[in-house]
């Protein structure tokens, strides 16, 4: 079985089955560990068309495939149909959870049913938290009566929940999602939505100058250099385009909104901040940019390519303590943190903690959620900005990771 999908890198090559190149790729492709989605195999599998009795050019497109004959004029950077070998669709199993098979991936939360369900619920909570799906400017930017005149890019799209909303609400735009794994369920994808399988740490050069909106939410744990990501986004946006960035800072705050400053030298209360301290350190070991949220506003505000910079933050009382009864949305977020603890467990174990140590952190944090009388906050920091007309220098060759 092969899935029609965009592919920008190969899986980890630790085993023979995992290191197979797509059929038709050259030995040099295999050596470089990179399969360019703009250079498809000559012998692409078209068996999915056989039951229709129609050629691929006659058959309606599915959301996860694309042919240049259908899109070459509407989407200049689209390419031939690419077939991903079954080995690329496999996931790595670690500590009972499943993960992206991308080599050297920094992001280390699971890609399985439990985590996808959490992401879907979190998306709905974000809508309630902000009272809107999108920044106010987005509607005006994406409004068009011409197919694919406007384009929207979602980096780290996960289940595709945000980019699906965009594709439905703006049916004339082209919506593109990028993630380390294949989107789990594409059956309800609108026809103007497609996805790419890629690691954004490798750069966005193939997108430069082609999008009107770029959205990135909760990516920092999987990004090696977030400031460099902003450089890439600035070059991806067209003049007048919009960027929206939303990140947590991987710290917990007390009832006075002061940061807990704890160490990983002991297992002691407060437990939720202690768990987050260990998690913060584990992400650092994987080279994730855990400090990105703290610097988002400065990085965007001082960038020569952006203007009309706007900052918002939300203080989320994950542990309500003595606060008045929470809105249902915050209660759901609190419940979802228990799922988040389980999702973070493999990374804590990978960082060197024992099963017993992780159990102590996790069980006491959950107890603290429901028994503590002291309010504890998580801080969400958000930056929106418009792309101005400034012509930016090319990124140095050292930034071309591919």
Curated annotation (Swiss-Prot):
**Gene Ontology BP, a term:** sporulation resulting in formation of a cellular spore
Region described as Disordered: spans on this chain: 1-70
EC top class, in one word? transferase
Q: What's a Gene Ontology MF term here? A: methyltransferase activity
Loss of this gene results in the following:
Leads to the production of coprinoferrin.
- Report the protein's function: Methyltransferase that performs automethylation. No other methyl-accepting substrate has been identified yet. Acts as a global regulator for secondary metabolite gene expression. Negatively regulates the production of coprinoferrin, a structurally novel acylated tripeptide hydroxamate siderophore.
Q: What does the entry say induces or represses the expression of this protein?
A: Moderately expressed during the development but expression is induceded in the mycelium stage.
- Bridged cysteine pairs (disulfide): none
Biased region (Acidic residues) positions are: 11-21
What is the protein named? Secondary metabolism regulator laeA
The subcellular localization recorded is:
Nucleus
Q: Which Pfam families match?
A: Methyltransf_23 (PF13489)
Q: Which organism is it from?
A: Coprinopsis cinerea (strain Okayama-7 / 130 / ATCC MYA-4618 / FGSC 9003)
Q: Which family does it belong to?
A: Belongs to the methyltransferase superfamily. LaeA methyltransferase family.
Q: Name one GO cellular component term.
A: nucleus
EC number(s) from the headed UniProt entry: 2.1.1.-
